[in-house]
Amino acid sequence: MPRAHASRLAAAALLAATGLSCTDDSNPSSPITADLAQMATKRGPTLTPQTSGTTARLIGVHAVNQNVAWVSGVGGTFAVTTDGGATWHAGVVPGAEALEFRDVEGVSAMEAYLLSIGSGSDSRIYHTTDGGESWDLQFQNADPDAFYDCFAFWTPNRGFAYSDGVNGRFPVIRTTDGETWQDIGDNLPAAQPGEFAFASSGTCTAAQGGKRGWIGTGGLGDARILATTDGGDSWAAYPTPIVQGAPEGASGIFTVDFRDPNRGILAGGDLVRESEVLPNVARTRDGGATWELATPFPFGTVFGLSYVSKAGLPAVFAVARGGVAWSPDEGDTWHELPDFLDFWAVSFANQHAGWMVGGEGRIVKISF
């Protein structure tokens, strides 16, 4: 087995062993202003545990609006709320009982996409238009060496999914109709030996506006950002300063998000040294071309993060197995919430409607 493939599988195994998107801000319940930012900084978030209806480990979450959110996890599990989390409807996709849905993209109360990870045919994309009552298999990977980690969407019908490199090439796929997926790997820079991403929260990809997209990588190679400004027709690769290149192939970028076309944040770490506070957070002000280190996340390796709103606030919420924390200033300072353990992913629709998910079916609503 090639070293890169073995390291990628080892990193996936580490994630499994630890127990191991296009957000809609069109309907915030109040305007986002500097006063609101100051108020949020003073009082911090309100965190409310909710009942998910499942005990499966939840790894993906997408907040569509203040009422609708979708989550996904192991054992082919998904769940959806249409009332702000007061109730959740959980289910298992037929035929996917052995799969891990590491990413979910909600469109509405009725429509969503799920992505499962794994080598070969375990990497799949499912789609529902009836609230999860039935699911169509849209894509099933046929390359035994490809491993799809996450996806991101610009619109309900336009998105892309990332696979780790195979023989120096990233077999990224794209949909322009919400039904079929085409390989656009020739549009991307060459993959470095041993370069891959981490499927820790379904947020190794991000999409913003109508055409901008980003992919965060790591593994045995450098931790790079792959970026497009034209909907995936062309991509460029940019270096980042976070921890990377660990010989075990378990370090790099785990999660990335953008609040506008230029300003974004990424985070990650090293799975082998998961609890160590390393250079694990960086931010950009030029669309991902250059990155500067921010204050390290206080609980070690970051699995997922999200801006509280895509409408302008620099506030960020980040989660890890060792604790969660939020920053009012894009990573300059972190406010710790150490009592919340084993969380994998977080997503906000607006400052009043965010959710984080984790082990044993945990869901917590977050409101600033």
Name every feature range the model reports, one short phrase each.
Residues M1-A10:
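Bacterial N-terminal signal peptides that target proteins for export
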Residues A10-A16:
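Hydrophobic helical h-region of N-terminal Sec-dependent signal peptides
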Residues L20-S21:
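C-terminal motif of bacterial Sec signal peptides marking the signal peptidase cleavage site
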Residues D24:
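Short, conserved catalytic or interaction motifs in soluble domains
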Residues I32-F368:
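Residue-level hotspots at or immediately adjacent to binding/recognition sites across diverse folds
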